[in-house]
Amino acid sequence: MSKIYGFGNALIDIEIQINEDQLSSIGIPKGGMQHISRDRKDYLLDNYKNSIKSMTPGGSIANSLFAAESFGASTCFSCSLGDDEYGQLFLNSYEDRNKIFFNYSDNPTGVCLVFVSPDGERTMASNLSANNQLSAECISPSLLESCEYLLFDNFSLATDSGNQTVDYCLDTINNEVKVCFGLADSGLIVENLSKIKNLSNTNLHCLSGNKLEHETLDQYTSLNYKKRLVSNGEKGASVNGYQLSAPKVDLINTNGAGDSLIGAFLALEGQMEEEQALKEAINYSSQVCSVNTPRLK
């Protein structure tokens, strides 16, 4: 059984169904992600309140760990939450409170507005809020020191406190821990490029992201990794160039699919051959595309 420690954004995903014209008016490139202010979040929520389809706990690393648990992994997630209704909703998604280690922030719990267009593509607007207070104090040293995998992503590089958390974790773990990094968003790669380059001295076990994210990274820099996991939508995914197709599903939206792919793969790679682990992870993440939330219940 794999032990995976992850840290990152704790968000409430609010899925909103919109048409292409409405998406254009929001001003975020289709399929992309943009950080927004609290006022902008409140405005969009009020404007599209009648189009809300679901409100569920999310956040990329939290979603990945949820998928890993589905395949028998032991996980722990560290984050920063607001002491509010959304924070309680996030906590309630953990039947075992020992699997989440967090601090309360004076700011509200973070929210991600997930705009789903008719083709199932998701475009995101995130108000990080409490997540800006993610810090080393949110980390459990004992659980971190005993983990086999450390999982985090590019979103944590977007704030000074998040960067400090990354540095703390990388300095604390032993050399046997498999460090896994998610690229998260192509636009964020450019924004965080100098911080990503700081990871060049880290021997990553797995570098994950979608095809566009990997292509964007390759334009600017390179990282040291053992495995490169690339998701490619309905075409499937690949590990170090070994490509497998995805099964056909009734697509609702793609929110959480890439998160689930990495979580499932990390949980499975120690249980079976790599090709089989990739196949199982693709099948699982494809099923995530057929539900209205970023996680399979």
Where are these regions (language model features)?
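Alpha-helical transmembrane segments within multi-pass membrane transporters and channels
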Residues: 80-82
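Short catalytic helix/loop segments, enriched in acidic residues and glycine
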Residues: 21-49
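Active-site alpha-helical elements of protease catalytic centers
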Residues: 56-78
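Short, conserved aromatic-histidine micro-motifs
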Residues: 33-39, 85-89, 279-292
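Ribokinase/PfkB-type carbohydrate-kinase core domain
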Residues: 1-30, 53-56, 76, 88-104, ...
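Short pre-catalytic strand/loop immediately N-terminal to key active-site residues, enriched for Gly-Thr
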Residues: 48-56, 244-256
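Conserved post-catalytic alpha-helical subdomain immediately downstream of the catalytic base
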Residues: 70, 247-297
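Short glycine/serine/threonine-rich phosphate/pyrophosphate-binding segments
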Residues: 59-64, 110-111, 262
